[in-house]
Amino acid sequence: MDNKEVTLNDADVIEVKKNYFFDGLSCPVPVYLRLSQGHYLVIAKPNEKALFSSLNSFANAQSRVFVEKVHYDTFIRFVTSLTESMIGNETLPAVTKAKYVQGLSHHVIQLFENKKFSNEQQLTRVSSLVLKLSQSVSGFGEIEKILSALPNDDAKHSMATCFIAIMIAEEMEITQGQVFEKLSMACLLHDIGLHYIPNEFLKKPRHDWTPEEHAHYESHPIKGIEALRDLKEVTQDVLIMIVEHHENALGTGFPKKIRDVKISPLGRILIVANYFADLLFERVNGAQSYDAPLAIEFIENVLGQPFNKQVFRALKNIIILNEMKKRIDNAK
């Protein structure tokens, strides 16, 4: 293709990761490389195969790639779909898959940034840790196949839950690599049981569910461990966390309505991370979404803080420290 220069308003474009792109990729939207302020080079036209390796400027480590903001959602849906198909392709090398999972992680990072949760440097570090752990787990390819069967929103929710849980664990000074591995796996797999729940009522607002539909939904932690228990890579500790992820300290959760003292230590972290991710990202149909500080207030003032005190305190500390950092940065 002929690469031509165009003039664009810098406020109308958004940066995307270069590792999304490879020779022969046919992207559904135009892709640009920034030359200078307001000046861009078209490096991919919609639905045309691009040859990125032929561009010296693309190979430059300092070069940055953009799409127009109006096309960003379309681009991310395309990348997510491509990621899922790559994960299920056994002929592709792990390093290629990792690049795309990393791209999806970057999208989750941007969602977090918009919700005022932590900072990009910390989230990027957690993203790298999640990828490292997932690649180090024996047989993780089988787990990736299961994950790829989930809808995009559920996959993003699982990744977001994983990010939050690891940051909470670090705030609680939990440092053992094996613990992070188990926690990450449980977070990524905790909603596998939803795959066995009919979509008809999952798409409805929860206040419209019948008692039978509520009961069906509340069975999904059990269905999840039933689907996973034959995988030798999924340990008993991980299965316990998965079945506990909708419990709470008061004993009013599901499916077993157990109190805090009977919930596993890592299960307490997954429970808080899962609920907090739901509040941030409008995952529940008909529910309001919150930025991070307001989500903390909602848990305290509306729910009456029904979670383990130490875990919730760690989450709150992360939010408070991040807000303080932003105020200091803004005052400079």
Give the label of every model feature segment.
Residues M1-D153:
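Non-catalytic interface/linker regions that flank or bridge core catalytic/transmembrane domains
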Residues H39-V42, G251, D278-F281:
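Short small-residue beta-strand/loop micro-motif enriched in glycine and branched aliphatics
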Residues E84-E218, E226-D230, D237:
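Acidic/His-rich, divalent-metal-binding segments that scaffold phosphate/diphosphate chemistry
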Residues L133, V137, I192-N199, H245-T252, ...:
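A short secondary-structure junction motif
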Residues L183-C187, A215, L228-I271, N285-Q288, ...:
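Histidine/acidic-rich helix-loop-helix segments that form or flank divalent-metal centers
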Residues E212-E213, K223-G224, F281, L294-A295:
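Phosphate/pyrophosphate-binding active-site loops
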